[in-house]
Amino acid sequence: MKKYLLGIGLILALIACKQNVSSLDEKNSVSVDLPGEMKVLVSKEKDKDGKYSLMATVDKLELKGTSDKSNGSGTLEGEKSDKSKAKLTISEDLSKTTFEIFKEDGKTLVSKKVNSKDKSSIEEKFNAKGELSEKTILRANGTRLEYTEIKSDGTGKAKEVLKDFALEGTLAADKTTLKVTEGTVVLSKHIPNSGEITVELNDSNSTQATKKTGKWDSNTSTLTISVNSKKTKNIVFTKEDTITVQKYDSAGTNLEGNAVEIKTLDELKNALK
């Protein structure tokens, strides 16, 4: 009789362990908030293998996994109705989540999104061959870089969406180049992978007396525009990803008034006149 009861007890214990993996709720788990407005349920108890069970729902897809830690970090996986595979990786310090969708083979990427605690994110989409075709980088301040029509050589179209307007350009050699043209003047903003921007101004005007030149100061993120060696304007690209303009006096020696934030593409073009 004792052996029978022990056997029943062992079976019930195993069932309980399996229940940790198959179904978690508010009674047997703890909910942990994650970057990207996600949540993961973590079992209060370890399973038969000494691991904590994890469960999360992303885009209406249920994902499951296990972890050695009870804080919610680990890897969860699931399968969509079309047999494509999903994988959610939660960093050990919970500061980053990586959600990936693979084709049925489990290797060829379809999409990938990395969310960070500071509310920034990187979202990528891949073509039928698993090659990167689109990419969106959302900064913590809400501005973003959008890349489309990315080819196998890494070139493509680029757009920087600022608070009030957007700049357009190209992606090539791991560098984003955004351009604004006003008459003979071309303003180019370069953003390398390192993120440290540089800005240059080129004027095709052949008349030296009215030809504009630009000098970039990386320490202050300021482009100083001059005409005939006389300073006329400062255009500042702030750390908050806004752009301001301030004029010099007629002698070109002192700045006048206050810097004014540029809020439209037309206002930026006017600053180049």
Curated annotation (Swiss-Prot):
It comes from the Bacteria. A lipid is attached at C17 (N-palmitoyl cysteine). The keyword Transport does not apply. SUPFAM superfamilies: Outer surface protein (SSF51087). InterPro entries: OM_lipoprot_Borrelia, OM_lipoprot_dom_sf. Transmembrane segments: none annotated. Keywords: Cell outer membrane, Lipoprotein, Membrane, Palmitate, Plasmid, Signal. The keyword Signal applies. Coiled coil: none annotated. GO terms for cellular component: cell outer membrane; cell surface. PROSITE patterns: PROKAR_LIPOPROTEIN (PS51257). Residues 1-16 form the signal peptide. It is found in: Cell outer membrane; Cell surface. It is a lipid-anchor. A lipid is attached at C17 (S-diacylglycerol cysteine). Belongs to the OspA lipoprotein family. This is Outer surface protein A. It comes from Borreliella burgdorferi. The gene is ospA.
